[in-house]
């Protein structure tokens, strides 16, 4: 959530930054006007309360002296009625302010490219060279069926579209991947966490999914619970409402969890395969950092995600998302896109973001600065390290062989009992 004081004191800068994110200046102007009206009403309310206190003292004095206090009582009743009217106006204005400010996206960092959509994203670097196949490559969904490791038909029967069963060495490959990813992150200083897979509405607000993106989630009817769309939500909210010791920062968390997405608005997109599912495993990284260190931590987090892809030998590129393509809470985002041979293109497999104090303000996560003793908002960061299903897809396609088998990357073999290849039965 944005700082209302910042909007008030640096309106033009905030308006210009949010314009690049599709926010109308009229919206901010209306918010500023509401804030000014609210502040004026607060002054009036305080003045009237001071009058009421004076009137109350005068009434008490008159009663002690056995004097008629009828007029003073009438005056105080009028003042009290005026205060109630103003308080009701303040409640209404506060709600209007909340309705606007809670759906405003974060302001982009100055280094973020300005653009309308993914066409304006900027490639930063590439790693690895896509393999030159001397046979016709298969898509991962066909490989999965031919190898008897992915069962789409029964997934659809048991649940519905965009669900599947992993089986045999497919299930083992998925498990090997997330154990490998977690082990690599732990080596980099991340604390492993097993989170709840359901959170409450306050947690969804804290990380920015609510109220704006409710339609993208699975809520449990007649409860305060939501299935997590990413482990970012419980990991970030772990410290919601707390004040941390500045000496403990930065703090690194990692977790593997299922992620549940309704994929509202994605009809017709990636209807086959592992790219877009309602339920998938993802290894998440979350950091809590001091503001002056958060962009250095973003580079480190991105490198942690890249490390996984490099050790798996998967070609990828790093993209800096433009203002029009970034997520709601992000101030800056790097996407990692892995090479998918059957599609002859790179597809997102990780997204690493610095939200600065946007989530921390919503969730009230603060730290006490050891230098001056003041309590301040910290910065939160989050990143995929990696999306496991998409990594399975990338391995199946990049490591496929002409005979229909798939070679298992060397780093995963210890996690798969020494298996070296997945072969057709």
From Swiss-Prot:
Transmembrane segments: none annotated. Pathway: Aminoacyl-tRNA biosynthesis; selenocysteinyl-tRNA(Sec) biosynthesis; L-seryl-tRNA(Sec) from L-serine and tRNA(Sec): step 1/1. Its EC number is 6.1.1.11. Gene3D superfamilies: Bira Bifunctional Protein, Domain 2, Serine-tRNA synthetase, tRNA binding domain. Its main location: cytoplasm. The keyword Lipid biosynthesis does not apply. CDD domains: SerRS_core. Keywords: Aminoacyl-tRNA synthetase, ATP-binding, Cytoplasm, Ligase, Nucleotide-binding, Protein biosynthesis. It comes from the Bacteria. GO terms for molecular function: ATP binding; catalytic activity, acting on a protein; serine-tRNA ligase activity; transferase activity. It is found in: Cytoplasm. Pfam families: Seryl_tRNA_N, tRNA-synt_2b. ATP binds at residues 261-263, 348-351. One of its GO terms (biological process) is selenocysteine biosynthetic process. It catalyses: tRNA(Ser) + L-serine + ATP = L-seryl-tRNA(Ser) + AMP + diphosphate + H(+); tRNA(Sec) + L-serine + ATP = L-seryl-tRNA(Sec) + AMP + diphosphate + H(+). Belongs to the class-II aminoacyl-tRNA synthetase family. Type-1 seryl-tRNA synthetase subfamily. Homodimer. The tRNA molecule binds across the dimer. Consists of two distinct domains, a catalytic core and a N-terminal extension that is involved in tRNA binding. Catalyzes the attachment of serine to tRNA(Ser). Is also able to aminoacylate tRNA(Sec) with serine, to form the misacylated tRNA L-seryl-tRNA(Sec), which will be further converted into selenocysteinyl-tRNA(Sec). PANTHER family: SERINE--TRNA LIGASE, SERYL-TRNA SYNTHETASE. This is Serine--tRNA ligase.
